[in-house]
Amino acid sequence: MLSKEVVKLLNEQINKEMYAANLYLSMSSWCYENSLDGAGAFLFAHASEESDHAKKLITYLNETDSHVELQEVKQPEQNFKSLLDVFEKTYEHEQFITKSINTLVEHMLTHKDYSTFNFLQWYVSEQHEEEALFRGIVDKIKLIGEHGNGLYLADQYIKNIALSRKK
């Protein structure tokens, strides 16, 4: 059985993961509205991944006979300036999630909850990959640019990432 504090912290993380899913759905819709179908498809798929992260936490709480408390998820941002703005915000959000996961890991070590510490290692690895992915997309958009054919090329680049991740 997990401590009440650990249950509370993991429930808060579920909420953060669900917010991320909604944020990426909002960003996906913005991309589709702006004819950026590659980025729209990528972010739509990524929203599903974020939801899966929350479900993984829910499963862990269920397996440890702990109470899952789904909380209200705040409304995500819906207005973006550009494709670069969208992906800079995804990168910033992933950094926020990484910080949150690291805080959880530190708490588990401090309180000698080695089972939950071990469980969270998957998230540590996942966040490393997520930050690298989004940083790479931001860098590529900056390199290609968003003027003229650049926006189309950036969208195609992101589309190719989405297609390669399906395999």
UniProtKB/Swiss-Prot annotation:
Enzyme class: oxidoreductase
Gene of this entry: ftn
Listed Pfam families: Ferritin
Any single GO BP term: iron ion transport
Annotated EC: 1.16.3.2
Residue sites binding Fe cation 2 per the record: E50, E94, Q127
Native organism: Campylobacter jejuni subsp. jejuni serotype O:2 (strain ATCC 700819 / NCTC 11168)
Family: Belongs to the ferritin family. Prokaryotic subfamily.
UniProt binding sites for Fe cation 1: E17, E50, H53
InterPro entries registered for this protein in UniProt: Ferritin, Ferritin-like, Ferritin-like_diiron, Ferritin-like_SF, Ferritin_DPS_dom, Ferritin_prok
Description of how the protein assembles with itself and partners: Homooligomer of 24 subunits that assemble into a spherical protein shell (12 +/- 1 nM diameter) that can sequester at least 2000 iron atoms.
Record's GO cellular component terms: cytosol
Role of this protein: Iron-storage protein.
UniProt cross-references to PANTHER family, sorted A to Z: BACTERIAL NON-HEME FERRITIN, FERRITIN
Coiled coil: none
Name of the protein in its database record: Bacterial non-heme ferritin
Record-annotated Ferritin-like diiron domain positions: 1-145
Domain of life of the source: Bacteria
